[in-house]
C-alpha cells in the first residue's frame, strides 16, 4: 500500500465477497492491531492505543466527539510486568493529555493531532504525524482522521508515538467525490510547511 511504502504502520487489508441475508457485497477486512501487526511492520512490541468510542455514544447517537479519548488495545502487553506497565501508563497519560488539548482547541486544530509535539516527546525534526496527516488527506482517507477511529503505537525506544493506519475508507464508493473536493477543504498550511518545508 502507499502508506506502507511511506513506512507507516499499516494492517493487512483485503476485500472479501460476502453474502448477508442473501445480499452479496464486497467488504473490507483489516488485520487486528496486535503483536503480529507490529512484527510485520518491523516494530518492537509495545503499547497500542485506539480512540475510545465508549464515551461518545449516547442513546445510539454520536455525540461528544470532541471529548473522545483513547484506550489501550493490546492489554496482554501491559500484563507482561512492571516495566511494560510503567511504559504503558506513561504513554497513556501523554496520549490522553494530547486528546484533551486537541478537544479544548478543536476549532483551531480541526482533525489534526500530534501527541509527540503536544507532549514535547520528540525533537522538532520528528515529522511523522504531519506527514501521515498529509498522506491521508492526499489519499482521500479523511475517515481515518475521526478521533475514535485513530490508532497509535508507542515506540519504547525513542519514547514517541507513531500513527497506525486504520479505517481510512480509501476503497469507499464515494472516495472519488472526496478526492475531487479535497482541494476545497481547509488544510492547515503549517502542517504541510512543517512536514515538507525542506522540499524547496
PLM regions: where:
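Active-site substrate-binding loop specific to GH73 endo-beta-N-acetylglucosaminidase modules
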Residues: 48-51, 56-60, 150-152, 161-168
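ATP-dependent phospho-/nucleotidyl transfer catalytic cores
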Residues: 34-136
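Hydrophobic or amphipathic alpha-helical targeting/insertion segments
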Residues: 18-19, 23-27
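Short, well-structured beta-strand/strand-turn elements
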Residues: 6-18
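Catalytic-loop signature of eukaryotic-like protein kinases
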Residues: 17, 141-153
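C-terminal catalytic region of ATP-dependent kinase domains
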Residues: 119, 140-141, 153-200
Amino acid at each position: 500500500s502507499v502508506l506502507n511504502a511511506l513506512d507507516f504502520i499499516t494492517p493487512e487489508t483485503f476485500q472479501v465477497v460476502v453474502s448477508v441475508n442473501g445480499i452479496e457485497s464486497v467488504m473490507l477486512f483489516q488485520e487486528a492491531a496486535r503483536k503480529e501487526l507490529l512484527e510485520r511492520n518491523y516494530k518492537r512490541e509495545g503499547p497500542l492505543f485506539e480512540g475510545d468510542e465508549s464515551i461518545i455514544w449516547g442513546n445510539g447517537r454520536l455525540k461528544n466527539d470532541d471529548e473522545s479519548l483513547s484506550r489501550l488495545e493490546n492489554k496482554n502487553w501491559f500484563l507482561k510486568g512492571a516495566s511494560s506497565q510503567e511504559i504503558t501508563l506513561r504513554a497513556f497519560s501523554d496520549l490522553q493529555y494530547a486528546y484533551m488539548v486537541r478537544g479544548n482547541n478543536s476549532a483551531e486544530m480541526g482533525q489534526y493531532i500530534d501527541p509527540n509535539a503536544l507532549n514535547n516527546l520528540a525533537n522538532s525534526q520528528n515529522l511523522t504525524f504531519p506527514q501521515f496527516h498529509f498522506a491521508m488527506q492526499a489519499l482521500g482517507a479523511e475517515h481515518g482522521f475521526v478521533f475514535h477511529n485513530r490508532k497509535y503505537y508507542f515506540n519504547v525506544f525513542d519514547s514517541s508515538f507513531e500513527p497506525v493506519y486504520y479505517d481510512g475508507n480509501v476503497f469507499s464508493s464515494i472516495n472519488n467525490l472526496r478526492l475531487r473536493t479535497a482541494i476545497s477543504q481547509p488544510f492547515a498550511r503549517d502542517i504541510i510547511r512543517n512536514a515538507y518545508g525542506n522540499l524547496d
